């Protein structure tokens, strides 16, 4: 079995392994910068580590590839009988991260 980790960033959790490219919530780093993310769980073959003291020594390192935007989400507010319509769109800002190591 391969080694993987669950990292928490931007209020979400992601399953990552070395070499994975993941889109996460925007981080304030320039493209090419190295990033370290906090780990919630590590699976190394048959052993699963969830102990907080052991996980304090573990970090997932990655490299920021680029900043991009997610798909457009359209919001439409409507109130009956008043003629009130409001259309709005939103694109979430994302960071593309390549995982370089789990240490």
From Swiss-Prot:
Family: Belongs to the bacterial ribosomal protein bL21 family.
Keyword Ribosomal protein: yes
Species the sequence originates in: Mycobacterium leprae (strain TN)
HAMAP family: Ribosomal_bL21 (MF_01363)
GO molecular function: rRNA binding; structural constituent of ribosome
Gene Ontology BP annotations: translation
One family name in Pfam for this protein: Ribosomal_L21p
Gene: rplU
Name of the protein: Large ribosomal subunit protein bL21
PANTHER family, A to Z: 50S RIBOSOMAL PROTEIN L21 (PTHR21349), LARGE RIBOSOMAL SUBUNIT PROTEIN BL21M (PTHR21349:SF0)
